[in-house]
Amino acid sequence: MENQKLQIQINSNKLLKELEVQEFTDDIVQSLIIAMSRTQFELLNLDDTCQLIKNEFRFLSLREVRKAITKGTAGEYGRSYKLSTQEVCYWIQQYVKDKNAKTLKL
């Protein structure tokens, strides 16, 4: 009986984690679609870009990733001549750099 309860709890936790990952991916895709609209460039590899963002910037919250993409599309990190995985990652890196600089000043 205890083993069964434990197994149910483990399965529930796995399912929750999978849902969180899917929600994170869906929100990043939505942000990238908005970025395409704002920059009027097409990003050809949405799935690969999402996966890279999740892997490389896992220390950031979804809110921070979305904020970085929004600032990037607004030109806060310079002009964009294309929309690529490299460009989006550059925006996020600049966001992290700015965030760390503000933290160090406090």
Can you name each region flagged by the protein language model?
Residues M1-L106:
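Charged interaction scaffolds used for protein-protein
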